[in-house]
Amino acid sequence: MVVGGGGEGDQKRSSGEMMAMASLFNDQQNPIQQFQVKFKEVETNFKTWLSKQSIPVEAAVVSTMSGVQGAFIGGLMGTLSPEMPQAGVDPQAIASMKQAQALVGGPWVQARNFAAITGVNAGIASVMKRIRGKEDIESAVVAALGSGFAYSLVSQGLQGQPMNAITTAAGFAVFQGVFFKLGERFSKPSTEDPFFTRGRTMLVKLGLEKYEKNFKKGLLTDPTLPLLTDSALKDANIPPGPRLMILDHIQRDPEIKGKRK
């Protein structure tokens, strides 16, 4: 009985030391890495919350956020745009440049234009994605048509000719369609392995996402997480510090720990 009690005490002491070392290792993480992990966590939680809202609410939130970003970019571009030279320039060239400058406008005008383009585009794209359940060229073209009309409306007002608005919207749609197709052609679709979803989430939360390849090479799939041991992680070539953090996280996570029983 005494021997059994001593063994149990040693096991608890060893577990406590492991948790303390994991906590110390976690505290010594790079602050930039910690910020990135927290940012990803907040972003994931926000996207999860947004996906549960109604279509009008999601469209309003996405349009507002994208519009603010567009206004900032447009204002910055308007502020940094070079001044028009006056001396030694042909008068006809100056007149043409003045017309172009009047069309583009200063920081406030560009902020307004970019806010309309990005806000409407993002809002329509979110609605199309919720309705169609995917992001495709049709959704991109419809969103571009809407942003083209919005740009024409805010830049020319109700006095602009309808044909100009149609031409602008069509130009936006063609450009967006070509850009979407080029993106599809040159980018490789990232297919997430469903057997490593929980493990990937855990590694990102701990700031250890670079060891995802080790998990895949060692076939440490989601069903094996409750069974993980130090030797199994060592066989997957994961260093001692990250091993302690992973085991500590599994021990603290009630959902993973509960599957051991």
Swiss-Prot record:
Biological-process GO terms, alphabetical: mitochondrion organization; protein insertion into mitochondrial inner membrane; protein targeting to chloroplast; tRNA import into mitochondrion
Keyword DNA damage: no
Pfam families for this protein: SAM_1, Tim17
Membrane topology according to the record: Multi-pass membrane protein
Subcellular location: Plastid, Chloroplast inner membrane
Bilayer-spanning residue ranges: 59-77, 113-129, 139-155, 163-180
Principal cellular location given in the protein's record: plastid
Position of the signal peptide: none
Description of the deletion phenotype: Plants lacking both HP30-1 and HP30-2 are yellow to pale-green and impaired import of CEQORH in chloroplast inner membranes.
Domain of life: Eukaryota
Repeat is among the record's keywords: no
Keywords (A to Z) from UniProt: Chloroplast, Membrane, Plastid, Plastid inner membrane, Protein transport, Transmembrane, Transmembrane helix, Transport
Family according to the record: Belongs to the Tim17/Tim22/Tim23 family.
Quaternary structure and partners: Probable component of a protein-conducting channel made of HP30-1, HP30-2 and HP20 that mediates the import of transit sequence-less proteins into the chloroplastic inner membrane. Interacts with CEQORH.
Annotated function: Together with HP30-2 and HP20, triggers the import and insertion of transit sequence-less multi-pass transmembrane proteins (e.g. CEQORH) into the chloroplastic inner membrane.
Protein name: Chloroplastic import inner membrane translocase subunit HP30-1
Gene source species: Arabidopsis thaliana (Mouse-ear cress)
Organism classification: Eukaryota, Viridiplantae, Streptophyta, Embryophyta, Tracheophyta
Gene: HP30-1
